């Protein structure tokens, strides 16, 4: 679907980041509100790779059809703006939810529920040849029904080799999902490591992503490919807001290589959120899909114990801990939660060759005893979420509160705006917050 900016009325700003601004939008042509990500091309002078990253994210989104992954609803492009729409999620994210809990930790049962859905989403990405590289609680969003959706794919990368595991857990089409631009708590802001270019990748989607039938989705994908240009892919990426570039001595030239012996393609770029970065990425020895399973291990640890396992006083110390500090659990956690702690230990194996999920992919992770009893084929059908978000405010927007997203950017650049504005009529008003996405 093409986004008509003449009809799209922004209700509020959901987030701001290195790639642009996210708006909650009501559109008379659609019954549901959606999130509109808008990249201002005029900012490319200070963020030269943000445009390519934005187009890469659109390319990935256009190929997703899974209950725990967002889909591209549509996009539009003007001389100054590139905008794309995704379903809106009103339930916040796992980081917000954890901080709302009395002890700021999840129960093993809640961890099992949420992480099973995350594993399902990661499995789908890996089956499509995409390594995510940005898993963290802030990027695990809650739909209105309490199920989760991953977000932010600008740091993802296409690898040449697919994992051997089967695809994701649910073959059913995605239910009406919601999207919400995530934001960070000021007291728990995490920094992303800026991307380093993989200069040799062509970046084209794998063949199995293509469909012979010219469906509406395929037509949308063709348009995205046209926007991406002949090379596709994300190429080199600019750093995220408040991120500092880190270049370990062992860094190798950016490239994709097949490491032989049945191994998957490797990337030598250096991206992610520092507390979630895998050791092979810090060492610069090349990484593949296994970095996502390491991140799942960090996620489980943070959900269970309220902190990531290797966080240091600064980035240098954090990376040193990732490489060398022994994994520890508080108190008698190993006795009380043997399956949970064993899952974490196997996911946080510093040797990516023996890490859980590396050899057998998602099937190996799903077979771990911690997930015993999980109905993988029916996650959204038979599992009741531990937390159901309260209904979103559906109050009417009063005259003058809805606005044209183009006016937002005209004002930023000191340009005159039209004197007459249409107003929205079917969404709530709320104060803005800032974030990186």
Model-identified regions with their sequence ranges:
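Protein kinase glycine-rich loop
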Residues: 10-18, 22
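Glycine-rich ATP phosphate-binding loop
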Residues: 19-43
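Conserved N-lobe beta3->alphaC-helix segment of eukaryotic protein kinase catalytic domains
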Residues: 38-64
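A conserved loop-to-beta-strand element in the N-lobe of protein kinase catalytic cores
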Residues: 70, 79-87, 91, 95-96
């Amino acid at each position: 679907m093409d986004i008509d900016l003449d009809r799209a009325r922004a209700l509020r700003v959901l987030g701001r980041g290195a790639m642009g601004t996210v708006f909650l939008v009501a559109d008379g042509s659609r019954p549901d509100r959606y999130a509109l990500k808008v990249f201002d091309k005029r900012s490319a002078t200070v963020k030269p790779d943000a445009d390519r990253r934005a187009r890469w994210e659109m390319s990935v989104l256009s190929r997703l059809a899974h209950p725990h992954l967002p889909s591209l609803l549509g996009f539009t492009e003007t001389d100054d703006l590139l905008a794309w729409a995704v379903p809106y999620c009103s339930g916040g994210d796992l980081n917000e939810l954890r901080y709302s809990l009395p002890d700021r930790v999840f129960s093993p049962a809640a961890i099992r529920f949420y992480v099973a859905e995350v594993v399902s989403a990661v499995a789908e990405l890996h089956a499509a040849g995409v390594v995510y590289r940005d898993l963290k609680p802030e990027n695990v969003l809650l739909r209105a029904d309490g199920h989760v959706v991953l977000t932010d794919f600008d740091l993802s990368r296409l690898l040449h080799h697919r994992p051997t595991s089967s695809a994701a857990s649910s073959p059913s089409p995605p239910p009406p999902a919601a999207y919400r631009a995530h934001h960070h708590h000021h007291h728990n802001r995490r920094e992303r490591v800026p991307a380093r270019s993989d200069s040799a990748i062509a970046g084209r989607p794998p063949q199995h992503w293509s469909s012979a039938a010219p469906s509406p989705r395929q037509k949308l994908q063709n348009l995205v490919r046209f926007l991406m240009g002949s090379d596709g892919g994300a190429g080199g990426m600019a750093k995220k807001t408040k991120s500092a570039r880190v270049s370990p001595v062992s860094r190798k030239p950016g490239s994709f290589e097949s490491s032989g012996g049945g191994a998957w393609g490797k990337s030598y770029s250096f991206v992610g959120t520092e507390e979630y970065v895998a050791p092979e990425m810090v060492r610069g020895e090349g990484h593949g899909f296994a970095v996502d399973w390491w991140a799942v291990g960090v996620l489980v640890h943070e959900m269970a114990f309220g902190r990531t396992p290797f966080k240091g006083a600064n980035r240098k110390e954090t990376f040193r801990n990732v490489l060398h500090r022994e994994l520890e659990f508080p108190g008698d956690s190993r006795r009380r939660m043997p399956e949970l702690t064993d899952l974490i230990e196997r996911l946080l194996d510093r040797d990516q060759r023996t890490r859980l999920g590396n050899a057998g992919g998602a099937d190996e992770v799903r077979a771990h005893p911690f997930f015993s009893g999980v109905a993988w084929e029916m996650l959204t059908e038979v599992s009741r979420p531990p937390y159901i978000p309260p209904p979103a405010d559906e109050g009417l927007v009063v005259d003058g509160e809805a606005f044209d997203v183009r006016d937002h950017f005209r004002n930023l650049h000191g340009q005159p705006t039209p004197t007459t504005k249409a107003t929205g009529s079917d969404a709530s008003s709320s104060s803005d917050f800032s974030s990186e996405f």
